[in-house]
């Protein structure tokens, strides 16, 4: 059974910036865009777009995602104790928008397969990498829960050139420079 979320016992409210100012500050930080997925008790897939994801530790391999405490996906994820983080590729804006919108069936027309470690949904398209995780810890922080996942499976997809980014409330693509070794091979082949 996954751990119950702990809560930060601090009263931080006095003297803080307002929410809009905070979002403007954080919007200046470019982030990757992920879709966090899990399965509900009935085996139904759940997922949401998440830009608050990052690595925590190499040994053991841990990552974290931050999810709104009112989210149905968070509830399913904590009950299941397993989830996947699907890192979207440049051009994956429509997938990000689908999983960010309040629609009934976010997985309609989305290609995915059961992950190798726990069967949670791993997206088959629009991703540069994925990580399958077991919930290691959860901490309520304000209106979100920080979920720490122990990475049990996953990997990059080297054939996909660049990730999707989010900056100042807009999508962007990471600029990809051509690998000089590949460029030399291409020039040699073209001769």
Curated annotation (Swiss-Prot):
Pfam families: Flavin_Reduct (PF01613)
SMART domains attached to this UniProt entry: Flavin_Reduct
Organism domain of life: Bacteria
Cleavable signal peptide: none
Reaction catalyzed: a reduced flavin + NAD(+) = an oxidized flavin + NADH + 2 H(+)
Task performed by this protein: Catalyzes the reduction of flavin by NADH. Subsequently, the reduced flavins is transferred to the tetracycline 7-halogenase CtcP.
Protein name: Flavin reductase (NADH)
Organism: Kitasatospora aureofaciens
């Amino acid at each position: 059974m996954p751990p119950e979320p702990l809560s930060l016992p601090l009263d931080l409210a006095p003297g803080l910036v307002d929410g809009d100012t905070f979002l403007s500050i954080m919007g200046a930080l470019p982030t990757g865009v992920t879709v966090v997925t899990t399965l509900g008790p009935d085996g139904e897939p759940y997922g949401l777009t998440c830009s608050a994801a990052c690595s925590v530790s190499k040994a053991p391999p841990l990552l974290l995602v931050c999810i709104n405490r009112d989210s149905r996906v968070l509830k399913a994820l904590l009950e299941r104790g397993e989830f996947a983080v699907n890192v979207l590729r440049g051009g994956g804006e429509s997938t990000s928008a689908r999983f960010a919108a309040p629609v009934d069936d976010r997985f309609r027309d989305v290609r995915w397969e059961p992950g190798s470690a726990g069967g949670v949904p791993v997206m088959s398209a629009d991703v540069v990498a994925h990580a399958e995780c077991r919930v290691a810890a959860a901490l309520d922080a304000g209106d979100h829960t920080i979920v720490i996942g122990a990475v049990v499976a996953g990997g990059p997809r080297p054939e996909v050139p660049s990730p999707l980014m989010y900056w100042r409330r807009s999508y962007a693509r990471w600029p990809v420079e051509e690998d000089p070794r590949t460029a030399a091979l291409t020039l040699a082949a073209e001769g």
